[in-house]
């Protein structure tokens, strides 16, 4: 489901700008339970080049990340739109680890001039690229091309002609499967799916689909080719959005009845050692926007995640399923969140049981359809994402971003402290929990007169920031200053401004009813010290329904 963008005003804090916690003080078992499992990546974005347009596809081979889409140039990290541009026509290549722009830069031009799909051969020597283009560099092409990854040259022995847009490419050792909008390949009828040899010759594989193909994933040892898209009929039979075909003949193996309602479309398919994962988007009531896991060998569903918000890409990695979407209602998914009118554009889930893990980097919707991220790929331990977005973690960043394993960011929404002294010898501190993009449990350090007096750990998330309190015991009639800071165990925010409180000498007494506006006889007034503005629940940039 597509949503429109909402903006929230930053909350002004007068008192505490605290953040995050010391690893030595963090309760490891509490953190593990709250986070739900291991995550390979921090939520803190690495410096990354940007595109002057939309990224539709990415692929990785030999430590290089290839990027395709609709753009005329790229620009360095931190550069504003239109500044420091380097020409790259719908295709660019980067070092996966350093992010450095590489010289591999064939221009993809012609009708619609858009790169929609790419994937490397199993040995990493060839990059197959599909889309809507007529020329690659000086070579005439027809919507698909093969590049040598060693030198970025066009393979002239690979010359299939495809009549319309190629939206999915799946290379295997013996065949390259193509999916998209087309009706003919190399002069012969092929309805939206085809297979060619590594030399580009059309293979006998043939299937009939009534609407475009958008995702392909081959499991050759199991004799299966997973196909996803907009279709409702395959080979003359009902098969809505997802089907498994015989990779040699194109005959239907499995049709997955009941998995997807009408007006839903499978956009992405990926596999790990024994499972396949599918993501979909839909339009209108009763659609399916989430992710499904199934057994590769049998096609049996393992779990079904009903988060709403148009899934564009799924990527299993080290026991975690990463996804790009604009999730806005995951209330029925373990570890999920309710619909608050905003979006979360990246998710991480345990592959075993779909539980959402505490990993919440984010983007805005950005350009075009305002979907946000469109594609994910991992290379050399770095997660890359591309799409329509123009912001990452509420900072300007267009088209591309990436995440490594180093946690560099302090928690969001620092707590605002208030003090209350209503009885002799007691000071009560109150604040609302902060939250962090990749750590559920944060530790709060409380300082009295500049000295650490207590630490308290608490789990929180952007949709759930509980109120916290702590009562200090001090001498009656004394005067003290308090401050707070919060840490995620790696990064700690600056300590808050100190607040001062006077502690009563005697308990408050009420012996007679006072006149209006006068204090009670014998009563000593309690003191409450607060910032100018009370704490607010987390507000994030997001989107509303469209």
Residue ranges and their predicted role:
Residues 518-524:
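Short linear segments in intrinsically disordered or otherwise low-structure-confidence regions
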Residues 511-512:
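Extracellular mucin-like PTS domains
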Residues 539-543:
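Arg/Lys-rich low-complexity patches in intrinsically disordered regions that function as generic
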Residues 2-5, 9-16, 22, 26-506, ...:
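Extracytoplasmic surface signature
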């Amino acid at each position: 489901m597509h949503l429109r963008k909402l903006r929230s005003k930053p909350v002004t804090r007068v008192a505490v700008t605290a953040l995050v916690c010391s690893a030595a003080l963090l309760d490891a078992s509490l953190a593990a339970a709250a986070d739900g499992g291991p995550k390979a990546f921090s939520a803190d974005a690495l410096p990354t080049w940007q595109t002057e347009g939309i990224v539709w596809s990415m692929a990785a081979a030999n430590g290089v990340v290839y990027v395709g889409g609709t753009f005329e140039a790229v620009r360095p990290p931190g550069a504003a739109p239109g500044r420091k541009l380097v020409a790259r026509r719908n295709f660019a290549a980067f070092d996966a680890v350093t992010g450095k722009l590489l010289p591999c830069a064939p221009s993809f031009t012609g009708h619609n001039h858009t790169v929609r799909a790419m994937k490397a051969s199993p040995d990493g020597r060839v990059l197959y690229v599909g889309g809507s283009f007529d020329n690659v560099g000086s070579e005439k092409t027809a919507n698909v091309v093969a590049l040598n990854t060693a030198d970025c040259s066009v393979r002239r022995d690979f010359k299939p002609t495809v009549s319309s847009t190629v939206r999915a490419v799946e290379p295997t050792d013996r065949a390259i499967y193509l999916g998209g909008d087309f009706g003919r390949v190399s002069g012969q009828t092929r309805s939206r799916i085809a297979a060619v040899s590594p030399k580009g010759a059309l293979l006998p594989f043939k299937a009939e689909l009534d609407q475009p193909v958008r995702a392909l994933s081959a499991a050759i040892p199991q004799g299966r080719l997973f196909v996803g898209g907009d279709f409702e009929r395959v080979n003359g039979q009902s098969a809505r959005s997802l089907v498994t075909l015989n990779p040699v003949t194109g005959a239907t193996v499995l049709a997955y009845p009941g998995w997807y309602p009408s007006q839903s479309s499978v956009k992405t398919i990926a596999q790990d050692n024994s499972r396949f994962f599918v993501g979909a988007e839909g339009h209108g009531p009763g659609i399916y926007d989430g992710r499904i896991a199934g057994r590769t060998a049998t096609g049996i569903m393992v779990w079904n995640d009903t988060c709403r918000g148009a899934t564009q890409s799924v990527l299993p990695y080290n026991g975690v399923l990463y996804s790009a979407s604009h999730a806005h209602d995951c209330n029925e998914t373990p570890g999920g969140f309710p619909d608050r009118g905003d979006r979360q554009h990246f998710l991480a889930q345990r592959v075993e049981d779909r539980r959402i893990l505490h990993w919440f980097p984010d983007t805005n919707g950005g350009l075009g359809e305002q979907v946000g991220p469109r594609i994910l790929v991992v290379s050399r331990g770095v997660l890359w994402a591309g799409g329509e977005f123009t912001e990452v973690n509420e900072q300007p960043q267009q088209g591309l971003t990436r995440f490594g394993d180093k946690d560099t960011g302090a928690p969001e929404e620092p707590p605002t402290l208030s003090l209350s002294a209503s009885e002799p010898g007691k000071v009560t501190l109150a604040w609302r929990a902060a939250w962090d993009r990749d750590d559920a449990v944060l530790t709060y350090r409380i300082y009295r007169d500049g000295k650490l007096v207590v630490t308290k750990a608490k789990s929180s998330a952007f949709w759930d920031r509980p109120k916290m309190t702590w009562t200090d015991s001090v001498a009656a009639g004394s005067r003290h200053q308090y401050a707070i800071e919060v840490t995620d165990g790696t990064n700690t925010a600056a300590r808050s401004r100190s607040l001062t409180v006077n502690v009563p000498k005697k308990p408050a007494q009420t012996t007679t009813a006072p006149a209006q506006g006068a204090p009670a006889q014998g009563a000593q007034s309690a003191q409450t010290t607060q910032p100018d503005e009370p704490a607010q629940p987390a507000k994030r940039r997001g989107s509303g329904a469209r």
